[in-house]
Amino acid sequence: KQPVLYVGGGAGMAPMRSHLYHLFKTLKTDRKVTYWYGGRSKRELFYIEHFKELEREFPNFKFYMALSEPQEEDNWKVKKDINDEEGDGFVGFIHNCVIDNYLNHHEAPEDIELYFCGPPLMNKAVEKMGQDFGIPDENIRFMS
């Protein structure tokens, strides 16, 4: 029952949504699943309510967001940490937010199964992140 980490950005939101809905709604997984989604500003975030609903329905699912360039009109309230219920999300590139707020505190990151989908630069950074934290290549999967 390895924990599962999803990291998405940009157009990667759609395939991630499909995969996560199948995992929870169809397969009824009991694995611990965390989804981190990044965009430049709030305008680039989609399906937010869908993921928040999944989070309410399944206690083994956590959803986090990050903006790399939050705009004033976003009124983005920065989370202090992953337990902060009042903040909207984090600020920075999504892979850095995952490292700082999740992987650096994970007791066994090498046991994680990692799925990711997003723009090419993000994909490259997330793949390197997984390797840097000792996640075996067979547990790192790019979704297209």
Where do the protein language model's features map onto the residues?
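Surface-exposed beta-strand edges and their flanking turn/coil or helix-capping segments
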Residues: K1, G9, H19, I48-H50, ...
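Reductase modules of NAD(P)H-dependent flavoproteins
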Residues: T34-S144
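Short, glycine-rich nucleotide/cofactor-binding loops
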Residues: L5-M13
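FAD-binding FR-type
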Residues: K1-Y6, H19-K25, L67-E69, S144
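Phosphate-handling active-site elements
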Residues: K25-K32
